[in-house]
Regions:
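Acidic, low-complexity Ser/Thr/Gly/Pro-rich repeat segments typical of extracellular/periplasmic
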Residues: 1-147, 151-154, 159-168, 177-192, ...
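Acidic carboxylate motifs that coordinate Ca2+ or other divalent cations, activating on Asp/Glu
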Residues: 171
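Short beta-rich binding modules
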Residues: 197-199
Length: 254
């Protein structure tokens, strides 16, 4: 379990690009390039490694002012002995006076067969112009898991457009018609509410001891559905060339 970190979790006014997170046992990292996501997205990939009981993160991009940073480890952190994952662990700090804590979540399905889409980047744009998806990197970002599920954390109050992108060149914007994409016409307005749920305490592995109601914070929307499809490659290319005369030729394009 988590012991301490530098900076502290949810620290504000942090200007240090190096983060150290310590746990109570030796750990290792698995598939960081596939599982770990930093938000806002980093154009220069961060250096993330395990060292004994610590995870060390070095952010290469310059820190943006008054911005909440979230490092979502998913299940990349595992104990060194048995390989048990520390599931859904994330770490946040802010470069400003306050830290943003809103979240949205949902599922990406393939439009053709409604199967879950794994490994798709899902991001938010505060710029509501439809062209922002092709011109600007995401403002906040996450990645779908094997069930197609995603959670985008560290969101400020406001209105957003949401998009999915199978980002082959890792620039967090739609600049290739061959990339699989997903989007919603609806404007996303993150919010939260107090909610209750049933929690079970077990006497042993087969006997329920107590069922109690516990309070928690529910982040909304938590049921976004995005349908992914591959864009149509409408780029022109030379399909045929003819030269019927010495001083005359014909070029045909798609």
């Amino acid at each position: 379990k988590f012991v301490r970190s530098s900076p502290k979790p949810y620290a504000t006014n942090n200007k240090d690009k190096k983060i150290a997170i310590e746990f109570d046992e030796f750990i290792k990292l698995e598939k960081t390039s596939e599982k770990v996501v930093v938000s806002p997205p980093q154009l220069e990939q961060p250096d993330i490694k395990a060292s004994g009981r610590r995870v060390l993160v070095n952010l290469m991009d310059s820190l943006k002012p008054n911005t909440t940073y979230t490092i979502d480890f998913s299940d990349a952190i595992v104990d060194n002995n048995e390989g048990n994952p520390l599931g859904n662990y994330s770490f946040s700090f802010s470069t400003g006076e306050t830290i943003d804590t809103l979240e949205v979540s949902g599922t990406v399905l393939a439009a053709a067969d409604l199967e879950p889409v794994k490994g798709m980047m899902v991001g938010l744009h505060v710029d509501l112009d439809d062209s922002a998806f092709a011109k600007k990197p995401f403002d906040r970002v996450s990645r779908t898991d094997s069930r197609g599920r995603f959670t985008i954390r560290g969101i400020a109050p406001g209105k957003y457009h949401i998009f999915g992108l199978m980002d082959g060149n890792q620039n967090y914007l739609y600049d290739s018609k061959t990339e699989m994409i997903a989007f919603s016409d609806s404007i996303i307005v993150p919010s939260m509410e107090a909610a209750m749920r049933q929690d079970t305490l077990w006497k042993d592995t087969v006997t329920i001891d107590t069922i109690k109601t516990v309070g928690y914070t529910r982040f909304l929307p938590d049921d976004i559905i995005l349908r992914a499809f591959k864009g149509i490659n409408d780029r022109q290319y030379l399909s045929k060339s003819e030269r019927d005369k010495e001083n005359h030729f014909i070029l045909s394009f798609s």
